[in-house]
Amino acid sequence: MVRLTIDDQLAEVEEGATVLDACKAAGVEVPTLCYVPFLAPYGACRMCTVKVADNGSSRLTTACTLPAAEGMKIVTDDDDVREARKIVLELLLARAPDAEILHELAAAYGIEKSRFLAAPKEEAAPVAEGAPEFELEAKPKKCILCGSCYRVCEQRVQAFAIGL
């Protein structure tokens, strides 16, 4: 077992668990967008950013990709962590202004509008001649680039049919 401190609370998890696993085990809520329990950790969305405090210094990192280590001290909610998450949300909102999940999180973080410029409108890719008679509707203004579609296709279905 690995013991670590999360927001001044002792947590214990199995060897090989991530900091996100430890937070969940301790009942500490950490927001995620790209985390899918049955897929390998990815860290693309950066919403699970936490602070790792060590020997008087600290660094921000993703909880879903960081292996829990003995004696680790984790901070999940302070000014630095909140500011990092707010910037991530604003960037994602500029990229995907129609994504409802982003608006829910933005409201929780007090964000009404992104301060960053919106992404230019993406045109649909042309359909190749002789392509099958079906169409997958892409919604680029809703895509938050979490990689979940791609990773499920690759890791679970093993079709390797979707690219990022």
PLM regions and their residue ranges:
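N-terminal cofactor/phosphate-binding cores enriched in small/glycine residues
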Residues: 11-70, 84
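Fe-S ferredoxin-like electron-transfer domains
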Residues: 46, 54-164
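Eukaryote-biased recognition of intrinsically disordered, low-complexity regulatory segments
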Residues: 1-9
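A generic secondary-structure micro-motif detector
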Residues: 9-10, 129
